[in-house]
Amino acid sequence: MRHEWRLCPLGKHWVKAHPRTGTKGIRGHCRSNPSGKDQIYLDEIREIAHRNFSHLVGGPSANRLGFSQGNKFDELIRGWTQFWNEVLRPDVPLDPDLVKALIASESGFRSTVKAKAGKRAGWARGLMQITDWTQRILTDEGGELKDHLVNVNQADLSDPVANIAAGIRWLFRKKETATSRLGRAATWDEAVAEYKSYLGDVMAGKQPAGMRIFRSYHVRLKGQE
């Protein structure tokens, strides 16, 4: 089902107007996806946020969590959480406060931060610390995502609107893989553990420091501390 914010039919993606040497500029238009899978590219990601997010209401909580830029990305968190909840329709909707707590624990709301994430993962980039390995999966038409790909490159991930759109999509995927590993429906907290590569420790009854930090932020956003 096509989301009302999308600019093109399913199986196509939006390409913004761009100049062409020696000719008139090409206006924004829909282009077919080779695989037929639903994909969203940077131009449409930006356009969706620009057209739709400013009038939305609701979470996340306006708590900076001690960070100077702690509330700067609330509109993007709110918008992309709503978008992916409506597209992917989980039994338990994703909470925007959980996304904000995840961003706080991953990057401290620093949109251009870059960290080494290991030999296979490569670099982790931006607000939600999306790795090079994850970025390749999100864009791979023949890969593990059955549908709803986010086609952004490594440079795009320094843009908060793209990073949050891609990071939330990946969190939904991690909920699926956590469910498979657990043999039951994973909670969103367990999806975060899988996102952070801590699910094995959590399953063993351990409390990794990264999860304690994330949970403390989430509790504060829910006004429980």
Q: What name fits each language-model region?
A:
Residues 91-113, 130, 167, 193-196:
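Short, functionally critical alpha-helical segments immediately adjacent to catalytic or ligand/cofactor-binding
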Residues 86-94, 182:
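Short, charged helix-capping/linker segments at alpha-helix termini
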Residues 72, 94-98, 123-125:
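Extracytoplasmic
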Residues 112-117, 205-206:
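Short, solvent-exposed loop/turn and secondary-structure capping segments
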Residues 115-141:
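Short, surface-exposed glycine/acidic/tryptophan-bearing loops
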Residues 1-40:
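Arg/Lys-rich, low-complexity, intrinsically disordered basic segments
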Residues 32-79, 136-225:
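Non-catalytic cell-wall polysaccharide-engagement segments
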Residues 80-85:
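A short alpha-helix/helix-coil micro-patch that ends at or immediately precedes a cysteine
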